[in-house]
Amino acid sequence: MRILKPHLRSTSIQCYLCLLLNSHFLTEAGIHVFILGCISAGLPKTEANWQFVIRDLEKIDNIIQSIHIDTTLYTESDAHPSCKVTAMKCFLLELRVISLEFKHHVLNETVENLIFLANDRLSSNGDITETGCKECEELEEKNIKEFLQSFVHIVQMFINTS
């Protein structure tokens, strides 16, 4: 399975150390490379953009229309901004249901990519504890079209606050 990781990078200090320790890199240029490498390793990584999550939601919507999936999923239709992380986690759990119930390669790959991107973005919020929010099972079950529309709305809440 190929997971797309747009805008993600990682820097390894070991590579720069290896280059520096080789005798022919003990020059002024080699030292500059080492210092710049150390500085870039300390910079925060660029995270996936919520726009890629919306793109994957649109792709899922197109796939669902083409293979005529008719299912109901727990859907948060009017999430309060203070409960957006909880709502997002519920949406991601319900996406796993789609992936497990429907054996469609492109659909499953897109769902997994979307889950990866959203979880990566959520991890930047740390361990936020939201109180007074509905549990996933307390949400109303709606058809998949309404589920995806509500999902886009939640993602837009994240975009508007970042």
From Swiss-Prot:
Keyword Cytoplasm among record annotations: no
Report the principal subcellular site.
Answer: secreted
Does the record's keyword annotation contain Glycoprotein?
yes
Q: Which GO terms describe its molecular function?
A: cytokine activity; cytokine receptor binding
GO biological process terms, semicolon-separated: immune response; interleukin-15-mediated signaling pathway; neutrophil activation; positive regulation of cytokine production; positive regulation of immune response; positive regulation of peptidyl-tyrosine phosphorylation; positive regulation of phagocytosis; positive regulation of T cell proliferation
Propeptide stretches in the record: 30-48
Intrachain disulfide bonds: C83-C133, C90-C136
Q: Which residues form the signal peptide?
A: 1-29
What subcellular locations does the record give?
Secreted
Q: Which UniProt keywords apply?
A: Cytokine, Disulfide bond, Glycoprotein, Secreted, Signal
Which Gene3D superfamilies does the annotation name? Answer: Interleukin-15/Interleukin-21
Q: Which InterPro entries match?
A: 4_helix_cytokine-like_core, IL-15, IL-15/IL-21_fam, IL-15_mml
- Gene Ontology cellular-component annotations: extracellular space
Q: List the carbohydrate attachment sites.
A: N108
* PANTHER family assigned to the protein according to its UniProt record, in alphabetical order: INTERLEUKIN-15 (PTHR14356:SF3), INTERLEUKIN-15-RELATED (PTHR14356)
Annotated function = Cytokine that plays a major role in the development of inflammatory and protective immune responses to microbial invaders and parasites by modulating immune cells of both the innate and adaptive immune systems. Stimulates the proliferation of natural killer cells, T-cells and B-cells and promotes the secretion of several cytokines. In monocytes, induces the production of IL8 and monocyte chemotactic protein 1/CCL2, two chemokines that attract neutrophils and monocytes respectively to sites of infection.
Entry's family note: Belongs to the IL-15/IL-21 family.
Name of the protein this chain belongs to: Interleukin-15
